[in-house]
Amino acid sequence: MAGLRLIVGLGNPGPEHARTRHNAGFRFVDVLAEKAGARFGLESRLFGETAKIEIAGQSLWLLKPATYMNLSGKSVTAALRYWKIEPEEALLAHDELDLPPGTARLKFDGGHGGQNGLRDTMQLLGHGRFHRLRIGIGHPGHKDRVTPWVLGRAGRDDDAAIERAIDDAINVLPLAVAGDFNEAMKRLHTSNEGAGSR
């Protein structure tokens, strides 16, 4: 399988959304950029902020859509077209209600699971054949409480667990960038097994 050329963090722009559960994807690419000493700059034709980094000898783009979560696909598809990147060479990092904080999972293809950034991207692409990094934020217990939950900030313990999951994912990223997704999945899923209970 081809390696990665684009990593997209899904989230909402603006300081009021910083470090909310819904912005776990933004946090992931922010940490990647910080570790690489790269800075995000606004790219208006791509409707988002971009940075270029190198992992495992491969240069790749980071993207944070500035469209708000529900319209993320506009930015993602513009970037794929502009940089001539296949969807299979892209990884979308996003918050995942169905996983506890401290857990991260890699996945290829599948549905959107109610995640609006994925939903919009899949609608515009016409399929879901791209890689996803699902960063667990936990579930509030009832669907009526989901919106305030995702738009709120996690408590100290959950926030630290989300940070650990992001670090775990970054540790296996060189394998994914090189195209060895099976090994990356195996290592990531082993490294944070039972994370929800630590």
State each model region's role.
Residues 1-109, 119-133, 140-145, 152, ...:
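Nucleotide and nucleotide-moiety/phosphate-recognizing core
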